[in-house]
Amino acid sequence: MKIIVAGGTGFLGKKIVSSLADKGHNVCVLTRNLHKHKKTFSNNVKVIDWSTINPSLLSDTNILIKLNGEKVDQLWTKSVKSKILNSRIDSTKMLFDFCVKNEIIPQKFINASAVGIYAKESANYNFSVDENSELGNTFLAKVCLENERSTDIFKVFEDIDIIQLRIGVVL
């Protein structure tokens, strides 16, 4: 399968990309810093700069994975909060626009979200949550919700599976 990963150079992304490549998938990683990440992966992973993407490299993509976004483990100033939210929304729109412009229609779009979307009462270890559980009203819950809603634009592609990957705390 041909898989594009946006945000593949982060802690979790590196593990996912390496695992997919080891299983024989054709993996392309989109990065904002090509020079820094060119040698991050084995030779069977293509690392491509966001600003100079060659559409022919991404044609026939089966799966698009979006893991990128401003880190949340920093002081939440007004400016940082804006970056945390907008980095997720804007990158979804950029990926969508790129797909439309270049007639790339993935079968699956996997979007990284977080368990922070749930109400804080759900943080109790004795309490299970699923996609029908109560959503929270914290800043992070709102970021998760807006991030997930931003993927709705991909619904114009018939038969696409949009998957919201609600990840827990990664240490």
Give residue spans per PLM region.
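Conserved beta-loop-beta element that borders a ligand/cofactor-binding pocket
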Residues: 113, 149-171
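NAD(P)H-binding glycine-rich loop region in Rossmannoid oxidoreductase-like domains
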Residues: 41-94
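N-terminal Rossmann NAD(P)H-binding glycine-rich loop of SDR-like oxidoreductase domains
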Residues: 3-23
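N-terminal Rossmann-fold cofactor-binding loop
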Residues: 30-35, 51
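Conserved Rossmann-fold NAD(P)-dependent oxidoreductase catalytic core, especially the SDR/UDP-sugar
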Residues: 93-138
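SDR active-site strand-loop-helix element
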Residues: 6, 30, 67-68, 109-115, ...
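Short-chain dehydrogenase/reductase
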Residues: 82-89, 127-148
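Structural motif
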Residues: 2, 62-63, 108
